[in-house]
Amino acid sequence: MMNGSERHRLELRLGNQLIGHLEYDSQRDTFQLGYTPEWQARGFPLSPPLALDGSASSAQIRAYLGNLLPENRGLDHLIEALSVSRSNLFALIHGIGRDVSGAVTFTLPAEPDVPTRFRPITPEELLLRLEQPEIWPLEVWDGRPRLSVAGVQAKLN
């Protein structure tokens, strides 16, 4: 994902609708966020500092993205599951891009849509996770970070 080129891009989607894009310049370590003309005409900013006119600074975008990440052990589990560094904010956001708070997703351009799949959780598996969270964290299911499942805190919803 971050293999030598300077600019990296994620699409912002609300359902199936493309509403904008996030760009990261790895040489300058800066972010840019822009909305599609259609979204600018009838949508709303993702956050008050992320204005529809695209004037948000890299620091404002970085702060917004950082707030999408879990804290403490949740972040540690995410970093471990994705095998990326704590400072690689772009890779972290891409890694949880389909599972961030809210309805907007962050995906690579032309990344295929993966339908949501549900699976039953047995009482035994749930008990194991509650009794041994250091081995079976609530934030990782089936080898993937699942942040919205646990509310990114060591609790069950």
Question: What residues fall within each predicted segment?
Answer:
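Phosphate/dinucleotide-binding and metal-coordinating scaffold of catalytic cores
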Residues: 1-157
